[in-house]
Amino acid sequence: SWETEEHSMFRESTRRFIEKEFVPNRERWIDQGYMEPEYWQKAGETGLLCPDVPVDFGGGGGDFGFDAITYEEAQRGCITSFGNAIQSIVAHYLLRYGTEDQKIRWLPKMATGEIITAIAMTEPGTGSDLQGVKTRAVRDGDDYLLTGSKIFITNGFNADLVCVVCKTDPEQGAK
């Protein structure tokens, strides 16, 4: 089995947390379509967010198995409104492509649940074909101006930080 003793202990504490804090709120979250920010913060305090992000950036310093356990236990409790997978995906985009300043600024707050993230990939007419995205980002001084449309943005309702898939140079094709 891939689970170590540390993974098993994490699984048990994750299961207890989800049963105590999330399951009693499940129906309300389904009805309203999102989980309130204070529950993200409770999850962060418990170590359920970004458990495989390096400790230097506020994460748990573990391996992907810890993320997998949080996904499994959330699904076990039928908690579909806990978009922690998105939190992890955005964290890894930041780890791979972000500047040092961005990592320091955002990752610790993502791990505590102070910042909720979303990913805007899917577009009307192209779905999730990332090579076919039409959304553009054009440099405007120190900023970028975005033009385009996105749909099905998980966590979009209450996100503080959104990772947007777009093209800065359509001549580059899929790059």
Where are the regions a protein language model picked out?
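A short core secondary-structure module
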Residues: D143, T147-K175
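Short secondary-structure junction/hinge motifs that connect adjacent elements
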Residues: P24-T46
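A short, Trp-centered hydrophobic/proline-enriched beta-strand micro-motif
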Residues: G113-M121
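Internal helix-loop-helix
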Residues: E3, E45-E114, T154-L161
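Intrinsic disorder at enzyme termini
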Residues: S1-M9
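Hydrophobic, small-residue-rich alpha-helical packing segments that form membrane-like cores
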Residues: T126-D129, Y144
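A structural signal for short hydrophobic beta-strand segments in well-ordered beta-sheet cores
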Residues: T135-A137
